[in-house]
Amino acid sequence: MANVSKKVSWSGRDRDDEEAAPLLRRTARPGGGTPLLNGAGPGAARQSPRSALFRVGHMSSVELDDELLDPDMDPPHPFPKEIPHNEKLLSLKYESLDYDNSENQLFLEEERRINHTAFRTVEIKRWVICALIGILTGLVACFIDIVVENLAGLKYRVIKGNIDKFTEKGGLSFSLLLWATLNAAFVLVGSVIVAFIEPVAAGSGIPQIKCFLNGVKIPHVVRLKTLVIKVSGVILSVVGGLAVGKEGPMIHSGSVIAAGISQGRSTSLKRDFKIFEYFRRDTEKRDFVSAGAAAGVSAAFGAPVGGVLFSLEEGASFWNQFLTWRIFFASMISTFTLNFVLSIYHGNMWDLSSPGLINFGRFDSEKMAYTIHEIPVFIAMGVVGGVLGAVFNALNYWLTMFRIRYIHRPCLQVIEAVLVAAVTATVAFVLIYSSRDCQPLQGGSMSYPLQLFCADGEYNSMAAAFFNTPEKSVVSLFHDPPGSYNPLTLGLFTLVYFFLACWTYGLTVSAGVFIPSLLIGAAWGRLFGISLSYLTGAAIWADPGKYALMGAAAQLGGIVRMTLSLTVIMMEATSNVTYGFPIMLVLMTAKIVGDVFIEGLYDMHIQLQSVPFLHWEAPVTSHSLTAREVMSTPVTCLRRREKVGVIVDVLSDTASNHNGFPVVEHADDTQPARLQGLILRSQLIVLLKHKVFVERSNLGLVQRRLRLKDFRDAYPRFPPIQSIHVSQDERECTMDLSEFMNPSPYTVPQEASLPRVFKLFRALGLRHLVVVDNRNQVVGLVTRKDLARYRLGKRGLEELSLAQT
């Protein structure tokens, strides 16, 4: 753990800087806890001799890691450490994004120079970017689908030929070894590239994108390298036979594509195409990432409307009508691109019948009709889905806690992934080998039928579920005719795949949980339908396919707790509006029942990572708290004209300041300093880099006036303060912040209630909210962590502890 008082060595320091140093150095209290209410008394502002650095009130300091000395630059991802992450902690390592434009003089001057034609051009560029997002997301989805189809097909053909060969000769243990080895080999490569190259590419990426859109800066989450590892990893995971799907990671992939395209450059490749420079800020990037997430859903399921609703329900924290149109446009372009390219690949250029990575097939409303009497049955299935989803999430919670504590090294993570791959193949082989459920072989009933000990013209039905990609297994459970599976086969498959999927989610591989959830639900849903037909004998229950559909919706809803978007996704993926109402009932019931026991899977993992995630509303019992009780103090304030040495020292000491600094000024020597504006750390970094000093301007040493473009060129990887050399003479210079600060920051009185502060902060996407008294003096600063630390628990309002990492 780094000491917060660690200083950066500079070329020189004068006596005034040494006098100011005690205010800049704060040592963390080992084991110091955070008080229940972070109250701040009316502390007087303190000023160091001959400097303009202010501290207001009191603060409990915390320890930070070395890599966080400059929060505005993404830290290099270290190997995971054994840290006490859980849902009762809030990590200090996460920083916020700036979703509120800083309306300083540079910004206003640029906006005033833009005429109506230029604004129309900017709007056209937004639509062009959305089209590019849709096209590239669709192409990435095509690449994943084609590679998975070919590699998985090759693997299953080799294993099938080997099993057919050794079934007659004996020695099926060699077939088991071959299957387990192939699976382990693919997963080994997929896990190594994630664990050692880009850990943020693990999982589906949906929790990370939710956090990004919420305003939390997740390092490396939208990097080009992350996209490459994500795509490669998900291919290897699916081909490796894990209980995963390739659809969930498409949401992350689409988001990365959107973040890259919208900036008109690649910082990873160090290529700047000099286009779309206007959009190089967090506010614009956020909107395009929302479109990318929707395009990913659209490409995965062929559901453009569902993609828009998913982005609204699970992703985008900020919304407007124009954004809705652009997101829908990107989603439509994405699914059309995928459809068109796959039609060419399959040799049917004008047959646009493959809108998504998974095609659930058409459900014939006439053959699969439902009546009003089945509504209670569907609701009961929703209850089952909610309970099973809660069990799934609870088991995965304890498994994740175990991994955080004991499997935190990359080598151990790779070993676990390979072990799961081998166990998955072994369990599948044993179940297929032990099953005597033989069914007549029908044309096209399955891609790789295994005969084993069945008679000629028959195949092992357990293999139809296990010996296939998960997407094809889902379609098989939906559409295979009645009698294709016996109850024992479905029961065993449900039980085994449930635990395999639970064990698999959270591995250090790129994979999603959508398809495994659908597959589990389709299996027990089909079993539910078969049991119902046995009990009643009525023809109305004859087709188990509709119960497989309802079970799939119930299981997925019980795990991820989405209602609106999942209803539309299922309707679009099945090309059937008839079942819209029962699907909605099932999903709502599953969510209500599941929420009684535990959070949804994505929200649970966000909490386990101790992310300061802000929900839509403040806790319902928080009206008794005020801004004065939740704000952070002391606040580091700067003057309009500030010494360079003071600014350098402030930026070097991240333990005692935030990433925004109120700018204050005295009316005269007898009056207290009043708030004049707010300036960000990133802006100060750029000013220091370009040496925008008053003395240099007076001597004519500044070649040109700083423009907004200079700040955009530095975005998003602002250089660390350690990389900027400031000489002893330059430390004595002065910096005028008037032109660069935001002169109208959002403020609240210290008596404002927590819900009101929360609503203002959350709705406007703020990073800092200044708390002032009735004389407009700064008394505190509200940040994301100050609001996220209050959460409604089972026993009322809870305050989370701050993690020392």
Curated annotation (Swiss-Prot):
Gene3D superfamilies, alphabetically? Answer: CBS-domain, Clc chloride channel
**Reported effect of changing residue 299 to V?**
In OPTB4; uncertain significance
**Annotated consequence of substituting residue 767 to W:** In OPTA2 and OPTB4
Residues carrying the site annotation Mediates proton transfer from the outer aqueous phase to the interior of the protein: 247
UniProt site positions, description: Mediates proton transfer from the protein to the inner aqueous phase: 314
Alphabetically, which GO biological process terms does the record hold?
Answer: response to pH; transepithelial chloride transport
Q: What is the effect of changing residue 347 to R?
A: In OPTA2; uncertain significance
Return the protein name: H(+)/Cl(-) exchange transporter 7
Keywords attached to this entry: Antiport, ATP-binding, CBS domain, Chloride, Disease variant, Ion transport, Lysosome, Membrane, Nucleotide-binding, Osteopetrosis, Phosphoprotein, Repeat, Transmembrane, Transmembrane helix, Transport
Q: Give residues annotated as binding ATP.
A: 658-660, 783-786
Q: Give the result of residue 473 to N, as annotated.
A: In OPTA2; uncertain significance
Chain spans, region Disordered: 1-49
| CC per GO annotation | chloride channel complex; intracellular membrane-bounded organelle; lysosomal membrane; membrane
Catalytic activity from the UniProt record: 2 chloride(in) + H(+)(out) = 2 chloride(out) + H(+)(in)
Does the UniProt entry include the keyword ATP-binding? yes
InterPro entries documented for this protein: CBS_dom, CBS_dom_sf, CIC-7, Cl-channel/antiporter, Cl-channel_core, ClC
Keyword Transport among UniProt keywords: yes
The CBS domain extends over 631-695, 741-799
Please explain the role this protein plays, according to its UniProt record: Slowly voltage-gated channel mediating the exchange of chloride ions against protons. Functions as antiporter and contributes to the acidification of the lysosome lumen and may be involved in maintaining lysosomal pH. The CLC channel family contains both chloride channels and proton-coupled anion transporters that exchange chloride or another anion for protons. The presence of conserved gating glutamate residues is typical for family members that function as antiporters.
Q: Which residues carry this modification: Phosphoserine?
A: 9, 60, 801
Subunit architecture: Chloride channel 7 are heteromers of alpha (CLCN7) and beta (OSTM1) subunits.
Q: Which organism is the protein's source? A: Homo sapiens (Human)
Disease linkage? Osteopetrosis, autosomal recessive 4: A rare genetic disease characterized by abnormally dense bone, due to defective resorption of immature bone. Osteopetrosis occurs in two forms: a severe autosomal recessive form occurring in utero, infancy, or childhood, and a benign autosomal dominant form occurring in adolescence or adulthood. Recessive osteopetrosis commonly manifests in early infancy with macrocephaly, feeding difficulties, evolving blindness and deafness, bone marrow failure, severe anemia, and hepatosplenomegaly.
Which residue windows are intramembrane?
Answer: 206-213, 288-300, 304-312, 545-559, 560-562, 563-574, 575-578
